[in-house]
Regions:
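Short acidic linear motifs
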Residues: 2, 7-9, 16-273
Length: 273
C-alpha cells in the first residue's frame, strides 16, 4: 500500500472515532455488575490483612473509643479501594448473595463477617472525614453502612441480627457527627431526606421466621440425629452418649410442636400494633 493512501485511511479512521465521541467508545466495555453482592465480594478481596493490634485500633476508633492518630489514619487509608467498592455496591438496588439456604442449618454465611469488617472500616473512615471537615463524605459513609445492613437482608435470623447491628453502629456515628458538626441547614435537610428514604423500606421478620420454622421442622427428625448433634456442639453444648440414645421420634415430635408454637407466638407479638 502506498504511503499517501495509508495516511488517508488512518486519517479517516481517526475522524470516524472522533465523530462517535467518548460515549460511543465507552459502550465497547462490558457493563458493570447490576448485583451489589458481586461488587461486595470484590471489596472483600481488597481488604488488607491487619495485625490484631491494628484491627483493635480501627474497631475502637470506629466506635469512638479511641482518638485519631497518624497510625490509624494510615491503616484506614490502606482500604481506599475496598471503601470505594463498598460505596458503589451500597448504592445498587439489587443484592443477591447466592447463598445455599436449601442446606438449612448447614448453610454457610461467610459474607456476614466480611461485611462487618467493611462496615468498621467505613465508619472509621467516616470519623476521619469528619475530623478533616468533610462532613458530607462522613455522612455518606454512615449511610452506606445502613444500606449495607439492608443488603444483608432478612433471609435468616442471623442476617437480621447482623443487619440490625450494622444499622445501630451507623446510627451511633451519625449521632456523634451531628453533635460535632457546625450548623448547616442544607446538610441536615439532605441527611434527613436520606434517612427517611432508608426508613421507608424496613426489614421484616415474617419471611425470616417462616424459613426458620421450615428448617427446624425438617431438621428435627430421627434421620438427622448427627446433624442435630453437630448444631448443638457448634453452640458449645456437649452431648453425652446417653442423651443421644434418648433422641427418638417421640422426643423430636414434642420439640417440633414446642418450636412451632414458639415461632407462632413471636409472629403474633410482632404483628400486634
Amino acid at each position: 500500500m502506498r504511503p499517501h493512501k495509508r495516511k488517508r485511511i488512518l486519517a479517516a479512521t481517526c475522524i470516524r472515532c472522533m465523530a462517535w465521541g467518548p460515549g460511543s467508545v465507552l459502550r465497547a466495555y462490558p457493563p458493570d455488575p447490576d448485583n451489589a453482592a458481586l461488587v461486595y465480594y470484590q471489596a472483600f478481596l481488597l481488604l488488607v490483612p491487619l495485625e490484631s493490634e491494628q484491627k483493635e485500633a480501627v474497631a475502637e476508633f470506629s466506635r469512638g473509643e479511641r482518638e485519631l492518630t497518624d497510625e490509624i489514619r494510615e491503616t484506614v487509608g490502606q482500604f481506599r479501594s475496598a471503601i470505594e467498592y463498598s460505596l458503589t455496591a451500597s448504592q445498587m438496588r439489587t443484592c443477591s448473595w447466592g447463598l445455599r439456604l436449601s442446606l438449612g442449618f448447614n448453610a454457610s454465611l461467610p459474607h456476614l463477617a466480611q461485611l462487618r469488617s467493611l462496615s468498621r472500616v467505613l465508619l472509621a473512615d467516616a470519623r476521619i472525614r469528619a475530623a478533616d471537615g468533610a462532613w458530607r463524605e462522613a455522612f455518606e459513609r454512615c449511610l452506606a453502612v445502613k444500606r449495607i445492613g439492608k443488603h444483608v437482608g432478612d433471609d435468616v435470623i442471623i442476617s437480621m441480627l447482623v443487619a440490625g447491628s450494622l444499622d445501630g453502629a451507623a446510627n451511633e456515628v451519625i449521632g456523634d457527627l451531628l453533635g460535632a458538626m457546625p450548623a448547616d441547614e442544607e446538610m441536615l435537610a439532605w441527611l434527613k431526606s436520606e434517612l427517611a428514604t432508608l426508613s421507608s423500606d424496613p426489614l421484616t421478620a415474617g419471611r425470616t421466621l417462616e424459613y426458620e420454622r421450615e428448617v427446624a421442622m425438617e431438621t428435627m427428625r430421627p434421620e438427622n440425629r448427627e446433624l442435630l448433634i453437630h448444631v448443638f456442639e457448634g453452640m458449645g453444648t456437649q452431648i453425652t452418649p446417653k442423651q443421644v440414645a434418648q433422641v427418638d421420634e417421640q422426643l423430636l415430635a414434642r420439640n417440633r410442636d414446642h418450636y412451632d408454637r414458639f415461632i407462632t407466638s413471636i409472629q403474633t407479638i410482632l404483628s400486634t400494633p
